[in-house]
Amino acid sequence: MTQKSPANEHDSNHFDVIILGSGMSGTQMGAILAKQQFRVLIIEESSHPRFTIGESSIPETSLMNRIIADRYGIPELDHITSFYSTQRYVASSTGIKRNFGFVFHKPGQEHDPKEFTQCVIPELPWGPESHYYRQDVDAYLLQAAIKYGCKVHQKTTVTEYHADKDGVAVTTAQGERFTGRYMIDCGGPRAPLATKFKLREEPCRFKTHSRSLYTHMLGVKPFDDIFKVKGQRWRWHEGTLHHMFEGGWLWVIPFNNHPRSTNNLVSVGLQLDPRVYPKTDISAQQEFDEFLARFPSIGAQFRDAVPVRDWVKTDRLQFSSNACVGDRYCLMLHANGFIDPLFSRGLENTAVTIHALAARLIKALRDDDFSPERFEYIERLQQKLLDHNDDFVSCCYTAFSDFRLWDAFHRLWAVGTILGQFRLVQAHARFRASRNEGDLDHLDNDPPYLGYLCADMEEYYQLFNDAKAEVEAVSAGRKPADEAAARIHALIDERDFAKPMFGFGYCITGDKPQLNNSKYSLLPAMRLMYWTQTRAPAEVKKYFDYNPMFALLKAYITTRIGLALKK
């Protein structure tokens, strides 16, 4: 039950939690807390529907949201965890994501057909991921927060913020004052609490340097019309496409890539290292056109494309904070810091933070005890998530200079994400069997390699850091890219938990496209599960103290039946 001080019990302007911002993190936190019968106020300076990015889901994001939905009884969060449920329950504007596609380019040259990698998202057990049309998804989650009891003030400007060990308060431009027991800042780069408490680090500590220009477009051709791999099961157009080149990358996120879509738009975003491509005063459209002129295969995809809204053109994307937790307040992940959209890790790391913070904040509210040590883990978690993502992305920007280095280093991402998924699925399987929240709290029980894709496996931690050292040697000019790439491949081959991951058809390359040999992913999934039960090393088997094949098929059948009954 909610505990309130007697003086504030009947004050309509007093809340247990005040949330600044109504994006996905704010509304998810609001829904969780309101479902637990706490009084929650969400304050939003703008209003819904609205344009924002962060449009591509990944399996770890969906697994984490599935856990949160099950733990706190919020089906709306479960609805955004697969393409099928998002398209059915949330918005027909949703695009489908069956793969991560990475295509390498060199200035002035047509794309070399062998220089690509593609990672397939399996059909089993929950189906493909989603391209979120955020204005619809965010509005859906806001409605869910309101449904569970959140009070929402949109188009509300806050002029004063207060937070100390005794409580929190905000004052609006209209002169209203709201008080609370805790405050969560989901305000992104312009987070007001970061400004008030002077939390931003100058200079930013992150190694990654990138700026961005992005918009939504009509008339973007499927890249399959320009480049098609013989025998390739999943089209580039059915996934999130990354065009890579020295000094940056371009995302292409189609919402119009399946027959049921009611959305003709494609999200397009160009990331550039400002040390290679300094920002100038020319318009974003002119800069984009000049970029397309340098890369003919990309230019062909955009020959007939037109933006439907003004371009957003940024300065350096990266920012960092020296702290994200203080007296009765917390900055959510993207209010604390940001790296880069590469690998779509922002939403996943936000979901990880939500899960960890919600459990701790609910206990603090019930105990009426907000002592800093209760939230110390959140501080370390967020900073480690950002730092490790920075390590990954900064190495990738180095690897964009040579396809051989990219092909080698990106395998650390592929292996890490699969292992991380094993860890999440195991925790959820235990919880589904026991309904004991301790089985989920174990995820945040201070794992030894906090922030890493697989936070409790020493072998992966060592592999990643060995590979990172090779890429950083290239960046520093101490080693040629081909030599570092060969060494990274050797490091992977030496690990019996890593090398077999590339034999199940989920990760294909230009020289081995035949590995993607099962359109519906049943055979690769069963082969993978069989390996985990038989020949996998102990560090992998530890994630399978349940029957994974039974759980896999049960989840698949349950999901399909549930969707069929809603037709």
Curated annotation (Swiss-Prot):
Keyword Oxidoreductase attributed: yes
Keyword field: Antibiotic biosynthesis, Monooxygenase, Oxidoreductase
Record keyword Oxidoreductase present: yes
Pathway: Antibiotic biosynthesis
Pfam families: Trp_halogenase
Gene Ontology BP annotations: antibiotic biosynthetic process
SUPFAM superfamilies referenced in this protein's UniProt entry, alphabetically: FAD/NAD(P)-binding domain
Mutant lacking the gene: phenotype: Cells lacking this gene lose the ability to produce pyrrolnitrin and accumulate MDA.
Gene3D superfamilies, per database record: FAD/NAD(P)-binding domain
GO MF, one annotated term: monooxygenase activity
Its EC number(s): 1.14.14.-
Function, as annotated: Involved in the biosynthesis of the antifungal antibiotic pyrrolnitrin. Catalyzes the chlorination of monodechloroaminopyrrolnitrin (MDA) at the 3 position to form aminopyrrolnitrin (APRN).
Name of the protein in its database record: Monodechloroaminopyrrolnitrin halogenase PrnC
Species: Pseudomonas fluorescens
